[in-house]
Amino acid sequence: MASSRCPAPRGCRCLPGASLAWLGTVLLLLADWVLLRTALPRIFSLLVPTALPLLRVWAVGLSRWAVLWLGACGVLRATVGSKSENAGAQGWLAALKPLAAALGLALPGLALFRELISWGAPGSADSTRLLHWGSHPTAFVVSYAAALPAAALWHKLGSLWVPGGQGGSGNPVRRLLGCLGSETRRLSLFLVLVVLSSLGEMAIPFFTGRLTDWILQDGSADTFTRNLTLMSILTIASAVLEFVGDGIYNNTMGHVHSHLQGEVFGAVLRQETEFFQQNQTGNIMSRVTEDTSTLSDSLSENLSLFLWYLVRGLCLLGIMLWGSVSLTMVTLITLPLLFLLPKKVGKWYQLLEVQVRESLAKSSQVAIEALSAMPTVRSFANEEGEAQKFREKLQEIKTLNQKEAVAYAVNSWTTSISGMLLKVGILYIGGQLVTSGAVSSGNLVTFVLYQMQFTQAVEVLLSIYPRVQKAVGSSEKIFEYLDRTPRCPPSGLLTPLHLEGLVQFQDVSFAYPNRPDVLVLQGLTFTLRPGEVTALVGPNGSGKSTVAALLQNLYQPTGGQLLLDGKPLPQYEHRYLHRQVAAVGQEPQVFGRSLQENIAYGLTQKPTMEEITAAAVKSGAHSFISGLPQGYDTEVDEAGSQLSGGQRQAVALARALIRKPCVLILDDATSALDANSQLQVEQLLYESPERYSRSVLLITQHLSLVEQADHILFLEGGAIREGGTHQQLMEKKGCYWAMVQAPADAPE
């Protein structure tokens, strides 16, 4: 297939993908500053009347958004599909579109906000006129100051919504929200409580500012008492709302966990038989239980904190803008310095820590090597050489320790100095605003307290976000099971009132999916008739159990057809089919529940105690069950280890007989039964009046059962070598006769 890249013309040097991305972004921002800043206001000054400044700034902003969005699409299109050379650029390129939106909407949104808060105030129009005109350089810089943090937040939150990778499970957040189901209302109520609690929490800074003004103005005692009372009421209400919100959220996450775990387990149960052979039971259970529990715990703790601080930060940002746009812009501009610089220095410090540990390990290795080989060191008189080598390693550690100390000091310094510079900047600008009368001293105190809470909220969000992203990413493993399409055919619709039990294998071939080139069965053609017992015998590995598995619809033939009363087996409804076709294996599964429930396992209608007892009597299980202290109510452990092999087989046979199947499969199901129980099974197969209402496929080691069969098939190498009654096959003196003469090689 031809490459999708066109060859570059001779003499032309193509830019790497990352360089192209940087160049396109720089040109886009340069065009925004040089062209859009001056051109768009001039164009709309001709189109929009001067009397409508707010409409004009919105027209400029939306047009700017459209142009920048088209440019961002062009840059993305030029770099999409490139290989690993610009894999690193793809991360920040994804923020171009939200940056375009933020740049276009920053000034219009700010202008609208200023208009709303200054509604009806004298001189308010003049105070916002510069903001209305986007060509002013200061306003344009303000748009970038507001847009960069907004775009970063938008991009970070948007990365939680990205679809899964190849073969993934789609959008993980949408899938998790889909698991809420009826709990969506509760989550909505939780978000409302978060908003109300966050607003109530802001009462302390607000009333602290008002009390500051009261102190400076020497206000009345009633004003002080009223403000203090309101602050106390709002603070208590905020705490109560937070408590209720946490309770609702944790309860909702508990419901989501139960629902999700049930859905995953149900999806696993719908998979084909090969799925359970290719995946270990422990791995499957890890997905069903541990992965869902880990996801639920992570979402309950981390997502709750993330939502609280996200809403709190947004509320604080809105109130800060309400209080002072200029001080808020100073806060937003310094946020990258406040968090990114300490983060970079912290990485340098962590790298030095790793190097120190590695150097310590190397020095220890030198000492261990010398001490463990002292005879060799002494025989070569190299004691001083080993000591010198150890001193060199210690010198390396000393140098690294000095660098680590410097890095620690720089890390601590950058964290404290960046926070201090922000406070100094706010106090300096705020002091000028107080001096000019633009804000009161109390308002400045309130803003400083809000700014401290806002900075703390951003810091918490930056620390929690990776954990939330990891939790959302881990949900993709769970959704792999939910989205996996079973390879077995869907359940059919046939549920006839009467089924004779005529089974026809028509040229059936089969190979297991994990070894498709190895045919286990080759062109099998035979019939199981109602009222007859067909015995299937042959050496180990000849495919007898595979025939039983095909008849249970656990696998699908790779060739030929398997018919039940003339209809393909998959056309029957799943539950109906397994009521009519019952099987008992050599090592049947007994579940961790009562013996009564084990016998009635899988029945949609609960059988009576008489029916359960009758089935147990026929299988030989009643004799030992009745001797137990609690009888049929005796609880069995998870693996049924308290029962012997014969007792488990008897219980499993009763579980099959209670269904009154028209097709009964006994796959070495009597190998562990005692003599009395085997005699009961023999009478059940050949003397019971019910034998005429069912077809029986018998696979057994006991020749006494085989000899009485109506038809015997000898299977070898996946093909039927001979068939007939016991007498006919013995007269032929073929494969069956040889097997009978050699008991050690008797069939399974």
From Swiss-Prot:
<dbReference type="GO" id="GO:0046967">
    <property type="term" value="P:cytosol to endoplasmic reticulum transport"/>
</dbReference>
<dbReference type="GO" id="GO:0034451">
    <property type="term" value="C:centriolar satellite"/>
</dbReference>
<dbReference type="InterPro" id="IPR027417">
    <property type="entry name" value="P-loop_NTPase"/>
</dbReference>
<dbReference type="GO" id="GO:0015433">
    <property type="term" value="F:ABC-type peptide antigen transporter activity"/>
</dbReference>
<feature type="topological domain" description="Lumenal">
    <location>
        <begin position="208"/>
        <end position="227"/>
    </location>
</feature>
<keyword id="KW-0812">Transmembrane</keyword>
<dbReference type="GO" id="GO:0042825">
    <property type="term" value="C:TAP complex"/>
</dbReference>
<feature type="site" description="Inter-subunit salt bridge with TAPBP">
    <location>
        <position position="32"/>
    </location>
</feature>
<keyword id="KW-0571">Peptide transport</keyword>
<feature type="topological domain" description="Cytoplasmic">
    <location>
        <begin position="465"/>
        <end position="748"/>
    </location>
</feature>
<dbReference type="Pfam" id="PF00664">
    <property type="entry name" value="ABC_membrane"/>
</dbReference>
<dbReference type="GO" id="GO:0046978">
    <property type="term" value="F:TAP1 binding"/>
</dbReference>
<comment type="subunit">
    <text>(Microbial infection) Interacts with Epstein-Barr virus BNLF2a.</text>
</comment>
<feature type="transmembrane region" description="Helical; Name=1">
    <location>
        <begin position="16"/>
        <end position="36"/>
    </location>
</feature>
<dbReference type="InterPro" id="IPR039421">
    <property type="entry name" value="Type_1_exporter"/>
</dbReference>
<dbReference type="GO" id="GO:0005783">
    <property type="term" value="C:endoplasmic reticulum"/>
</dbReference>
<keyword id="KW-0653">Protein transport</keyword>
<feature type="topological domain" description="Lumenal">
    <location>
        <begin position="320"/>
        <end position="328"/>
    </location>
</feature>
<feature type="topological domain" description="Lumenal">
    <location>
        <begin position="114"/>
        <end position="133"/>
    </location>
</feature>
<dbReference type="InterPro" id="IPR011527">
    <property type="entry name" value="ABC1_TM_dom"/>
</dbReference>
<feature type="transmembrane region" description="Helical; Name=5">
    <location>
        <begin position="187"/>
        <end position="207"/>
    </location>
</feature>
<dbReference type="GO" id="GO:0002250">
    <property type="term" value="P:adaptive immune response"/>
</dbReference>
<feature type="topological domain" description="Lumenal">
    <location>
        <begin position="440"/>
        <end position="443"/>
    </location>
</feature>
<feature type="topological domain" description="Cytoplasmic">
    <location>
        <begin position="77"/>
        <end position="92"/>
    </location>
</feature>
<keyword id="KW-0547">Nucleotide-binding</keyword>
<dbReference type="GO" id="GO:0042605">
    <property type="term" value="F:peptide antigen binding"/>
</dbReference>
<dbReference type="InterPro" id="IPR013305">
    <property type="entry name" value="ABC_Tap-like"/>
</dbReference>
<keyword id="KW-0256">Endoplasmic reticulum</keyword>
<dbReference type="GO" id="GO:0033116">
    <property type="term" value="C:endoplasmic reticulum-Golgi intermediate compartment membrane"/>
</dbReference>
<feature type="transmembrane region" description="Helical; Name=4">
    <location>
        <begin position="134"/>
        <end position="154"/>
    </location>
</feature>
<dbReference type="GO" id="GO:1904680">
    <property type="term" value="F:peptide transmembrane transporter activity"/>
</dbReference>
<feature type="region of interest" description="Part of the peptide-binding site">
    <location>
        <begin position="453"/>
        <end position="487"/>
    </location>
</feature>
<feature type="transmembrane region" description="Helical; Name=6">
    <location>
        <begin position="228"/>
        <end position="248"/>
    </location>
</feature>
<dbReference type="InterPro" id="IPR003593">
    <property type="entry name" value="AAA+_ATPase"/>
</dbReference>
<feature type="topological domain" description="Cytoplasmic">
    <location>
        <begin position="155"/>
        <end position="186"/>
    </location>
</feature>
<dbReference type="GO" id="GO:0005789">
    <property type="term" value="C:endoplasmic reticulum membrane"/>
</dbReference>
<feature type="topological domain" description="Cytoplasmic">
    <location>
        <begin position="1"/>
        <end position="15"/>
    </location>
</feature>
<dbReference type="GO" id="GO:0042824">
    <property type="term" value="C:MHC class I peptide loading complex"/>
</dbReference>
<dbReference type="GO" id="GO:0023029">
    <property type="term" value="F:MHC class Ib protein binding"/>
</dbReference>
<dbReference type="GO" id="GO:0015031">
    <property type="term" value="P:protein transport"/>
</dbReference>
<feature type="transmembrane region" description="Helical; Name=2">
    <location>
        <begin position="54"/>
        <end position="76"/>
    </location>
</feature>
<keyword id="KW-1278">Translocase</keyword>
